[in-house]
């Protein structure tokens, strides 16, 4: 007997050994199925033909009078489904409420989820349109059944499909054919080697498709796909930066300062060093050219995948060049003509040698701006004479497969545009020579960009739909979610007029990413809107033109701004690639479709500095109608307009530019927008003329607006520092101001600002103290926070957001509870309605040492009864799932009731606990700051030290550390405290003979580390010092027991976003001071906790682990009893405390032994351990 070893499926997925034990039963099942087929004589021979050829076109007569599909379902598919463990009932009706849409043959349950199964007749093609795979994909995309997994089968072939809501695409996770197993049984083969091979086929089938394992397989398979992408991305990026810029890896870059990196670039052979640029070219422009060249080459690789350019174009042209005797370099001989004379030139304008070149003659004109010669100054004068380096670049690119579609589990190395976003986001930071930390930029994972896009766009869509329903005066339709609106069973599904109005309304939604980076958020927004449109077209029973709809979304809905022009180019590239994915290549070659001009949707500029709607009092405008060239070009464009609509827009623009009365600037902004609308779908000479026109108009407006805005900020802006007085001190010149790259929203997106702003603003703004001194001064004069750039982005974006609009950012978690953000939270959360705040796991961003959260805001005043979702992922969560239970929502009043409007991570439990304490302990509740004076230790590097006490101001300096109930501090030397000689309060705190120390770091068990100290001296900054105020009704050991208790640690961790940090979880002095301290009136209880706490402290070095746990359990239980007075009756608690006080006569081990046998203590522990609230705190429920 041959024993099958445990094998791996693919991508290191191991199949459980138990699966192989089912082989014999499956063979028996297959035999029974074949017997049922043999019972129909006319079918048997044709079934053998099917197994031989793999496909056979059966007719109805072949099934002995039965229809092919019902026979296949009853005799083949259903027995196999039963074997796979599914319970099912066949659907009676094959029509949906829409009348002509199929519904699934089976809907089977897998635990709490459903899987759709579409059955097709034996021998049928599962890839045929409107059946099989196509049908399952349609169901998954439209979400009619609320499921994300489906199976298509014809009995022999089985295909597992899974919808990934993050990328809004369907993955084929497994395709498997049972033909060889049926053939093996039918022919009664006895080949052991063949049997072992077929056992492997069966094991894969059972593991991937059975009820027992399908969920496990889907989870592992999707995880492996993600892991494989990450590996490919990292490999590609490492090679990329080495080849293009000479850096070995990212860590190498981060270690180098500017001078050393420039030195390396001069010695290492890389693309950057081989670029020959025209005289006076800046280093930045040279870098931009290197990136632009790589953009173009990668873009061409994607064009190869789409069939727009010949396969292996770069490799073949390079090989031909090496064989030829061409005197000029490869870049000038092949790449320059390809970029500028082919891809950027319409076919009828190309030179004869280009039209007849075998490589270029069939390549269509693309348009779109990527291949224009004005992306870098003097771009046509750049060259690369080193052919070898270009060959290395081409060989590097040829090692990868570039695909515009999502990988479906192929083992081949593939790169798609989403992966390139990751590569380029890291590249942007290197090019800026600040590193990621300097720019505060990191690539945001798909699941986060998708979640933010979905949860900001969908609410707007729902609100817009409500307006449509209201306009149609339909009152009997109730809905609150998009799924309810787009459900096949809803009344809306039957009304095509409303659905078309809905489509039109979607085109009006304006979405902005003000820190666009590589365009990742815009791509997620594109996918979200496209998904909604797919569902509407499904209800309309119409085929959607995906290219047309993507084009409309990119031109009408999506806008971005970034201060880095390289980032802007990459963002545009990604949008073009998303569009090309669905491009009709034949239509492109016929000249019927072209790439749009999108450079005016995604702009370069400083999002934080520029005119929005301020009243510019010193504006002096130049009349554009005096510019003869502009007027002449416009006249020519009007004469040669493509159609009447275009002519109408051009005429209107000319009229607006000719006006000298009224508010001239508004007229110019409107004219600018009209010309852009014509430009974005223009090409060739007309596109070039329009672009020149647009740039000239924009430059002219900027020349007027920038000085006026500058004057408004520095003369009329708020200046609290000088009590509102005008001051020229530290005021920059307007030329310096222009270097900030001001972006005037009222000009570039004036038509949107005129409509009150953007509907949705999303993104991952940079974080940190990154604003320049000039920028900080501007923010101060605009009453905008400037201490962290992400805060500035939030405030500024709220001004750009339309009323009722949504804002979704990923920002540092410290915003949720940090003291420095208190004023901003109060202002934001009272003017805007917080919808969601989600604390993310550690290490969401590769290489980023900051914890993050997602914030979703709705620009409307909140109501007390509004609900807010607050959730904190466990910090080491590897797989993020954004499926939240309803009980995680809290009422808005709980946020507003907190004086600092903090968002406590452990919600809603922490709010429940704090409310319970306030209600139960009104008279006995106080706070740590009311009972103590406190301070933080010193930063040693800022002080002088001596081995002896030089004078009265040299205080003892203590070295060591503090743990729970353990103080390991000793005198090291003396610290010069003379700078604080007038701060008697601070000196007294450090020199107090008694105190409590608390470590700044929270331990790995999420417990505060506090201990008692009867030692005088100054301590380091890692320790906090607390000294009881005079006449405080408690003692140090009672307070120590409270601070070290399980409950207080839970409250602290639950309230503090800073304490959630995974690497070094921290406390802050401000947050510690707010800890609730309950002081019972019953002295007996105070004495009992004091005795227990002192016993734990005194015996620290003598206790074994079990005794330590036992003693701390009693302390924790007693604290629960003190804080939750309904847990234990007062009399019973008093009796327990009496016994404790009676038992602890001495602080020795005997006291602990006596406590163990005390029945009341055992009862106390049992009561606390079984309490539901306590179990939640301990995560045991």
Swiss-Prot record:
- Specify whether NAD is a keyword of the entry: no
Q: From the Swiss-Prot or TrEMBL record, what is one GO molecular function term?
A: N-methyltransferase activity
Q: Which GO terms describe its biological process?
A: DNA restriction-modification system; methylation
Superkingdom classification of source:
Archaea
Reaction it catalyzes: Endonucleolytic cleavage of DNA to give specific double-stranded fragments with terminal 5'-phosphates; a 2'-deoxyadenosine in DNA + S-adenosyl-L-methionine = an N(6)-methyl-2'-deoxyadenosine in DNA + S-adenosyl-L-homocysteine + H(+)
Tell me the InterPro entries matching this sequence: DNA_methylase_A-5, DNA_methylase_N6_adenine_CS, MethylTrfase_TaqI-like_dom, MmeI_hel, N4_N6_ade-DNA_methylase, SAM-dependent_MTases_sf, TaqI_C
Show the coiled coil region(s): none
What SUPFAM superfamilies does the record point to? S-adenosyl-L-methionine-dependent methyltransferases
Alphabetical keyword list: DNA-binding, Endonuclease, Hydrolase, Methyltransferase, Multifunctional enzyme, Nuclease, Plasmid, Restriction system, S-adenosyl-L-methionine, Transferase
Q: Which PROSITE patterns match?
A: N6_MTASE
| Family as reported in the entry's similarity comment | In the C-terminal section; belongs to the N(4)/N(6)-methyltransferase family.
Q: What does this protein do?
A: Probably a G subtype restriction enzyme that recognizes an undetermined sequence and cleaves at an undetermined site. Probably also acts as an alpha subtype methylase, presumably on the same sequence.
Q: What is this protein called?
A: Putative type II restriction enzyme and methyltransferase RM.MjaORFECS2P
């Amino acid at each position: 007997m041959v024993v099958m070893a445990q094998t791996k499926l693919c991508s290191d997925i191991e199949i459980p050994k138990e699966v192989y034990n089912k082989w014999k039963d499956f063979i028996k099942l297959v035999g029974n199925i074949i017997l049922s087929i043999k019972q129909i004589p006319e079918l048997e021979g044709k079934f053998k033909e099917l197994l031989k050829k793999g496909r056979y076109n059966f007719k109805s007569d072949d099934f002995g009078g039965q229809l092919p599909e019902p026979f296949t379902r009853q005799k083949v598919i259903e027995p196999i489904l039963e074997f796979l463990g599914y319970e099912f009932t066949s659907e009676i009706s094959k029509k949906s409420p829409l009348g002509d849409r199929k519904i699934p043959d089976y809907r089977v349950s897998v635990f709490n989820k459903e899987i759709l199964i579409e059955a097709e007749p034996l021998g049928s093609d599962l890839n045929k349109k409107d059946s099989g795979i196509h049908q399952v994909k349609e169901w998954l995309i439209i979400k009619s059944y609320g499921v994300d997994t489906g199976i298509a089968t014809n009995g022999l072939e089985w295909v597992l499909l899974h919808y990934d809501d993050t990328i809004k695409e369907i993955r084929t996770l497994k395709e498997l054919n049972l033909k060889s197993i049926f053939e093996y049984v039918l022919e009664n083969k006895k080949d052991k080697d063949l049997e072992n091979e077929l056992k492997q086929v069966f094991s894969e089938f059972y593991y991937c498709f059975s009820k027992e394992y399908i969920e496990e397989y889907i989870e592992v398979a999707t995880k492996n796909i993600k892991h494989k992408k990450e590996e490919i991305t990292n490999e590609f990026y490492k090679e990329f930066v080495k080849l293009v810029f000479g850096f070995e890896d990212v860590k190498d870059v981060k270690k180098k300062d500017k001078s050393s990196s420039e030195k390396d670039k001069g010695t290492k052979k890389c693309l950057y060093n081989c670029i020959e640029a025209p005289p006076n070219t800046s280093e930045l422009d040279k870098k931009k050219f290197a990136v632009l060249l790589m953009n173009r080459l990668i873009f061409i690789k994607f064009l190869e995948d789409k069939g727009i350019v010949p396969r292996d174009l770069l490799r073949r042209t390079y090989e031909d060049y090496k064989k030829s005797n061409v005197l000029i370099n490869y870049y000038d001989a092949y790449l320059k003509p390809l970029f500028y004379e082919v891809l950027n030139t319409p076919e009828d304008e190309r030179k004869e040698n280009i039209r007849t070149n075998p490589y270029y003659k069939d390549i269509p004109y693309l348009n779109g701006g990527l291949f224009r010669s004005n992306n870098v100054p003097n771009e046509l004068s750049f060259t690369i004479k080193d052919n070898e380096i270009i060959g290395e670049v081409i060989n590097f690119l040829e090692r990868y497969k570039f695909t515009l579609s999502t990988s479906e589990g192929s083992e081949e190395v593939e790169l798609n545009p989403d992966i390139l976003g990751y590569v380029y986001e890291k590249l942007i930071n290197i090019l800026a020579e600040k590193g990621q930390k300097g720019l505060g930029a990191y690539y945001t994972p798909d699941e986060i960009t998708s979640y933010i896009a979905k949860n900001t766009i969908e609410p707007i869509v729902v609100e817009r739909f409500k307006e449509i329903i209201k306009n149609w005066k339909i009152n009997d339709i109730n809905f609150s979610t998009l799924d309810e609106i787009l459900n096949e069973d809803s009344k809306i599904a039957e009304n095509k007029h409303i659905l078309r109005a809905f489509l039109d309304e979607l085109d009006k939604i304006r979405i902005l990413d003000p820190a666009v980076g590589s365009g990742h958020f815009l791509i997620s927004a594109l996918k979200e809107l496209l998904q909604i449109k797919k569902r509407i077209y499904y209800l309309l029973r119409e085929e959607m033109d995906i290219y047309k709809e993507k084009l409309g979304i990119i031109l009408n809905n999506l806008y971005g701004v970034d201060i880095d022009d390289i980032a802007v180019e990459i963002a545009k590239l990604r949008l073009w690639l998303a569009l090309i994915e669905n491009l009709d290549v034949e239509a492109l070659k016929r000249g019927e479709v072209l790439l749009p001009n999108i450079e005016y949707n995604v702009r370069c500029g400083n999002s934080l500095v520029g005119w929005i709607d301020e009243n510019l009092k010193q504006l002096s405008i130049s009349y554009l109608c005096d510019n003869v060239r502009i007027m002449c070009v416009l006249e020519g464009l009007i004469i040669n307009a493509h159609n009447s609509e275009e002519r109408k827009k051009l005429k209107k623009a000319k009229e607006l530019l000719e006006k000298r009365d009224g508010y001239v600037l508004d007229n110019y902004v409107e004219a600018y927008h009209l010309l852009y609308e014509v430009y974005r779908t223009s090409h060739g000479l007309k596109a070039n003329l329009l672009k020149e026109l647009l740039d000239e108009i924009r430059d002219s407006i900027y020349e007027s607006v920038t000085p006026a805005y500058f004057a408004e900020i520095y003369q009329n802006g708020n200046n609290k520092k000088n009590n509102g007085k005008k001051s020229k001190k530290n005021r920059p010149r307007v030329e310096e101001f222009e270097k900030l790259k001001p972006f005037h929203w009222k000009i570039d997106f004036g038509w949107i600002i005129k409509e009150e702003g953007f509907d949705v603003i999303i993104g991952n703004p940079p974080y940190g103290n990154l604003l320049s001194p000039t920028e900080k001064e501007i923010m101060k004069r605009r009453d905008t926070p400037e201490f962290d750039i992400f805060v500035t982005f939030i405030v500024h974006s709220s001004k750009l957001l339309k009323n009722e609009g949504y804002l979704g950012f990923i920002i540092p978690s410290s915003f949720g509870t940090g003291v420095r953000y208190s004023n901003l939270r109060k202002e934001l959360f009272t003017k805007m309605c917080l919808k969601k705040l989600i604390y993310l796991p550690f290490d969401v961003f590769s290489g980023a040492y900051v914890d993050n959260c997602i914030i979703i805001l709705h620009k409307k005043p909140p109501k007390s009864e509004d609900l807010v979702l607050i959730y904190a992922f466990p910090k080491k969560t590897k797989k993020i799932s954004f499926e939240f239970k309803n009980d995680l929502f809290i009422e808005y009043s709980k946020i507003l009731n907190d004086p600092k409007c903090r968002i406590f991570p452990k919600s809603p439990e922490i709010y429940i606990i704090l409310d319970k304490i306030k209600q139960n302990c009104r008279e006995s509740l106080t706070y740590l700051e009311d009972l103590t004076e406190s301070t933080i230790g010193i930063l040693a590097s800022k002080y002088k030290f001596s081995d002896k006490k030089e004078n009265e101001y040299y205080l003892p300096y203590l070295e060591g550390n503090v743990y729970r109930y353990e103080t390991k501090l000793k005198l090291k030397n003396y610290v010069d405290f003379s700078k604080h000689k007038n701060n008697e309060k601070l000196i007294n705190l450090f020199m107090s003979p008694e105190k409590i120390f608390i470590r700044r770091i929270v331990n790995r068990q999420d417990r505060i580390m506090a201990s008692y100290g009867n030692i005088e001296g100054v301590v380091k900054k890692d320790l906090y010092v607390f000294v009881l105020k005079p006449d405080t009704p408690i003692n140090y050991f009672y307070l120590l027991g409270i601070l070290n208790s399980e409950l207080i640690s839970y409250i602290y961790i639950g309230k503090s976003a800073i304490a959630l940090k995974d690497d070094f979880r921290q406390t802050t002095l401000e947050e510690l001071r707010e800890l609730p301290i309950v002081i019972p009136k019953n002295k007996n209880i105070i004495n009992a906790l004091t005795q227990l706490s002192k016993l734990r402290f005194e015996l620290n070095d003598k206790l074994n682990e079990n005794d330590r746990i036992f003693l701390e359990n009693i302390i924790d239980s007693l604290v629960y009893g003190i804080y939750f007075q309904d847990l234990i009756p007062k009399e019973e608690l008093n009796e327990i405390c009496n016994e404790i006080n009676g038992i602890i006569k001495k602080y020795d081990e005997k006291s602990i032994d006596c406590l163990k046998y005390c029945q009341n203590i055992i009862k106390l522990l049992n009561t606390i351990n079984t309490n539901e609230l306590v179990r939640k705190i301990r995560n045991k429920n």
